[in-house]
């Protein structure tokens, strides 16, 4: 009886079974874990916008801001660690990222809206107990309150897929990022030096492409110092606009004080000089936060005068938030 074909079939089955077992063993040996965390935020916010000529618009309302973060990590055979996360707000992805931790060689990652690399990672280093002084305040032309058009050291690539690299040492940390925006590349670097105990100084530089025709230079410098319960910070940001006489310079400082292990308060000011305007935009803000376990209460009062350099275009925001982390 010729059973050569049957033997070959059995050998194939044995080979496939062995291969499947090997792959399964490899997969489970290197399998990581996934977890879900998040926060539930209930807040009440009131905003008053004065556009001049007795044009005052006041809005009040309750706001629900809750998010979920799906994250996972696993160790490779070579000892490196792969991590992934995805942040969801109202069912939509607001940020996501993938990183490869190479130990002493640093971390290579790709992010979208992660604010983790390049100049964006040091865009605002001023200490605060709640929010930055420019948060949730309108601008004359409807610009976002935290991009280069209003003096903040962030680039248009924040919404694109960024390839980044971070290195952290005992004396300094280095961060770099690049992404394709409007048909060309945006790139930036940031360096932070731990000059002495409690004192950090940093510098960042990069380019911003708000449109196909524009390529602006962005630089920022900061210094922060912490001694006991007090932290102070000062930061200068410059936007060298490709269009003549359109540069933007911003000066930002702030101080925070930890009253005790639960209660902190802060105050800050930010002045933005628009070369195209005769009026400076002036923002100031007070924040207070109280934390008890996984629950926090935050009070913020921010005010902006001459929004985006437009005289008499003023607005103010007050909000009270209850944050529950889980």
Predicted segments, located by residue:
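Outer-membrane beta-barrel proteins
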Residues: 1-326
């Amino acid at each position: 009886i010729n059973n050569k074909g049957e033997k070959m079939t059995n050998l194939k089955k044995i080979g496939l079974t062995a291969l499947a077992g090997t792959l399964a063993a490899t997969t489970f040996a290197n399998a990581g874990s996934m977890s879900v965390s998040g926060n539930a935020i209930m807040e009440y916010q009131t905003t008053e916008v004065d556009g001049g000529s007795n044009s005052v618009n006041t809005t009040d309302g309750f706001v629900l801001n809750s998010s979920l973060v799906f994250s996972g990590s696993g160790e490779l055979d070579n000892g490196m660690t792969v991590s992934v996360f995805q942040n969801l707000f109202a069912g939509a992805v607001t940020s996501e990222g993938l990183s490869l931790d190479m130990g002493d060689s640093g971390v290579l990652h790709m992010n979208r809206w992660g604010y983790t690399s390049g100049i964006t990672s040091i865009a605002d280093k001023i200490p605060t107990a709640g929010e930055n002084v420019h948060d949730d305040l309108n601008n004359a032309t409807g610009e976002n309150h935290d991009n280069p058009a209003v003096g903040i050291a962030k680039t248009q690539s924040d919404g694109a897929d960024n390839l980044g690299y971070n290195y952290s040492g005992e004396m300094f940390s280095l961060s770099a990022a690049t992404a394709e925006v409007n048909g060309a590349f945006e790139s930036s670097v940031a360096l932070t030096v731990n000059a002495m105990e409690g004192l950090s100084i940093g510098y960042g530089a990069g380019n911003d492409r708000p449109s196909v025709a524009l390529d602006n230079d962005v630089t920022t410098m900061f210094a922060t110092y912490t001694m006991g319960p007090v932290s102070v910070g000062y930061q200068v940001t410059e936007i060298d606009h490709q269009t003549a006489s359109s540069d933007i310079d911003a000066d930002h400082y702030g101080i925070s004080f930890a009253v005790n292990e639960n209660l902190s308060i802060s105050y800050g000011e930010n002045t933005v000089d628009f070369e195209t305007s005769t009026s400076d935009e002036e923002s100031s803000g007070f924040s207070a936060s109280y934390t008890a376990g996984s629950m926090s209460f935050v009070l913020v009062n921010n005010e902006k005068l001459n929004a985006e350099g437009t005289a008499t275009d003023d607005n103010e925001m007050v909000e009270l938030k209850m944050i529950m982390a889980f």
